[in-house]
């Protein structure tokens, strides 16, 4: 699901500066005098003038989503910047992005060959893959089939419609107990940490068929690895854009490689255990489902593209990492918004109380009767835009967009944050208002408005786990709102300023919660 590699702007070391000085004249001449020939009838891409070697990195700053939004107002929805020595096309505006990713989807379906991408999942990552379109499409189809098979897998417990629902409900109930226990012991809790562990457990159940105690060392290590990965990748790596830096010592790169290596070893161990115990008549989880689909492919003589066992590891790695980070970040932001808008929190509780009651746990089948909760989630996705960019795209051939020529193999950034805050698309875009996604009488979800929100990408590279992620956020939220009422700590203001990274997270804080009526334990 959604990531972005944008550089962290800091001062270069002495050795980096020396290398830059040695190459600056040659590279500057190349950048200055080598121009791509523009076909007749098309225009050259507009954009700010880059500096030699570093390009426009000084202009991008620490909040690239805002900087690039400001530049789109100056240059339009299609413009070019230069990060280091690599030209990057930035797309903004809903119509332009939909034209590129849906109507011209094949042209923009590639991934740029960034240096760091080859180290994610040992180069076998589905999300970051630079494989040829046919190979990538076969792997994506396999992953999608495995997800669909598992999400529809029947639960052994008749209370639940499927295994996914069972995993979420059981973990949601345990999360409520954990938060209540923390309140009794400490008087407050860290919403992010508790939610992260619960979501990780759901993902572990889905991918690996196992549930951990919240304090299990293996689970804690997985959570810590994911947080470290987000911090390191979120700050970016200039070596992706200034190739000469690849040959210089880098503490951040060493940490990045170490994190990937440790997680790969964990997933390989799990996949190996699954192969050893695999039973076609007993599909336990997504890993089993992937193995099952791969075995069917091996038996199919008409199948042109086979998927290696190593690439199964990459797919599992992607599904775990993306699903875990997106859902946990979305849920932790949800709790922050509940606290920031207590009147909305109370309205959500009343909707759940009226439609579901307090005697049983909410289920996925209750969703049609909880339109305000769905509207609340959509507004969180839009207002926070905690995934401000998609993973970078890349053009697969020479193409054009809005009358501008874009060469093959051009890196493309999709500014989702701009779309979600575009005043031409939204009334009062910086106001938090879930009602914008309801029908005029407030009784139904306005799905057409909801489709304008962009968080999971679009087109051929759209997140394959989107439906599962949305179901997770919905069900987790319904459960905790039904059981708990969240509050700020007295005298402590709530800081909703996002911290830029792999996904934009709120600052860590302490909150309070009280059990709702009929839920005292």
UniProtKB/Swiss-Prot annotation:
One of its GO terms (molecular function) is heme binding. One of its GO terms (biological process) is hormone biosynthetic process. One of its GO terms (cellular component) is endoplasmic reticulum membrane. It is a peripheral membrane protein. Substrate binds at residue 229. Keywords: Endoplasmic reticulum, Heme, Iron, Membrane, Metal-binding, Microsome, Monooxygenase, Oxidoreductase. InterPro entries: Cyt_P450, Cyt_P450_CS, Cyt_P450_E_grp-I, Cyt_P450_E_grp-I_CYP1, Cyt_P450_sf. The keyword Oxidoreductase applies. SUPFAM superfamilies: Cytochrome P450. Its main location: endoplasmic reticulum. Cytochromes P450 are a group of heme-thiolate monooxygenases. They oxidize a variety of structurally unrelated compounds, including steroids, fatty acids, and xenobiotics. Belongs to the cytochrome P450 family. This is Cytochrome P450 1A1.
